[in-house]
Regions:
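Alpha-helix N-cap and coil->helix boundary residues
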Residues: 157-158, 175, 211, 215, ...
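Terminal helices and disordered tails flanking the catalytic cores of nucleotide-processing hydrolases
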Residues: 1-109, 265-301
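Short acidic/histidine-centered micro-motifs embedded in hydrophobic/aromatic stretches
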Residues: 106, 127, 165, 198, ...
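Acidic/His-rich, divalent-metal-binding segments that scaffold phosphate/diphosphate chemistry
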Residues: 63-196, 203-208
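Hydrophobic (often cysteine-bearing) scaffold residues that line and stabilize catalytic clefts
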Residues: 137-140, 198, 216, 285
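Divalent-cation-assisted or electrostatically stabilized phosphate/pyrophosphate-binding catalytic cores
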Residues: 183-204, 226-301
Length: 301
């Protein structure tokens, strides 16, 4: 039986929710039964380190299509975009063979939405960023990366891979992010460990799902590195960091600025723009904060 078991991917389990299947160790010994409710971050950590599960085989018709070619309105399609994102991330964490096709289809869907309705897409970020869920935040990262990448001058293929990275880089944080954002307490050591490990855990989940594009994985790996070498997980600095990773980092930072958390209020857009303008001073490639400011304009949608 142990040969049929696979590792539990980051993002597959959530604190406070029942296990969707029995969990085994590497030798096939049962650790926890289906339905057990995970209570703590340390339990979640142990399951990611030791846990295995037996995947269910599901037959799918070959003609199933993942890309929708309809003209897009971001407000009308908001629910569909979030549902598609959640389904895609679940496909990755469950190592579904359709995961890569779903991710590419979602990237095309989001890029098409941004291309057809740029002002509405940016307005959606600003209107819905007051107290967003983790899935909403991830969607906002994808939207902002789309616009910054093109303003910065990335070629189309690299820009699409950046969108894919934006949608998956925080996969390993999905189980705990909403809980962390709603807490006004100091982070525990376990919580800090989850945060610092999430880039590499997200990469592990992508690889396990058959998503192995080297540039995509490098963007995910580097999106919390800092130009001064103080970032994680590798402590890279300066030109060692991909511009795509800096674009994703800035997108996440901007969404954090305009988002309310339990421990602080959100910035208004004018304040956020002023802070972004200071980030060209050694924290990012100067052209990247400038690109975001150009995307936003003097009066963002």
């Amino acid at each position: 039986m142990s040969n049929s078991l696979i590792r539990i991917a980051p993002g597959a389990l959530t604190i406070g929710k029942p296990l969707p299947w029995d969990v085994f160790d590497a030798e096939g010994n049962i650790l926890l039964r289906q339905g057990y409710v995970i209570q703590t971050n340390s339990q979640l950590e142990q399951l990611f380190e030791r846990g295995r599960f037996k995947p269910r085989k599901i037959e799918r018709p070959k003609e199933e299509v993942f890309e929708d070619l309809r003209q897009r309105n971001p407000f009308a399609e908001y629910g569909d975009l979030l549902t598609t994102l959640e389904v895609t991330l679940n496909a990755i964490t469950s190592e579904d063979p359709t995961a890569q096709k779903r991710l590419l289809g979602l990237c095309r869907m989001l890029d098409k939405t941004c291309q057809e309705a740029p002002d509405a897409s940016l307005a959606l970020v600003h209107l819905y960023s007051i107290s967003p869920t983790i899935h909403e935040q991830i969607l906002f990262y994808g939207i902002l990366c789309h616009f910054i990448a093109r303003q910065f001058g990335l070629e189309e293929k690299r820009a699409t891979l950046l969108t894919a990275a934006a949608l998956t880089a925080n996969l390993a944080l999905v189980p705990v992010a909403d809980q962390l954002n709603a807490s006004n307490k100091v982070l525990t050591d376990d919580q800090r460990a989850v945060i610092r490990k999430h880039p590499l855990r997200s990469i592990d989940a992508l690889k396990s799902a058959g998503i192995s594009n080297k540039l995509l994985l490098r963007i995910v790996a580097q999106h919390h590195e800092q130009a001064d070498g103080s970032g994680y997980p590798e402590g890279l600095s300066g030109g060692e960091i991909l511009p795509e990773a800096e674009i994703l980092a800035l997108s996440e930072r901007y969404v954090a600025m305009i988002t309310k958390r339990a421990y602080r209020n959100r910035m208004n857009i004018t304040e956020a723009r002023k802070l972004i303008a200071t980030l060209a001073d050694g924290k990012f490639r100067p052209a990247i904060p400038r690109s975001l400011l150009q995307v936003l304009g003097d009066h963002p949608p």
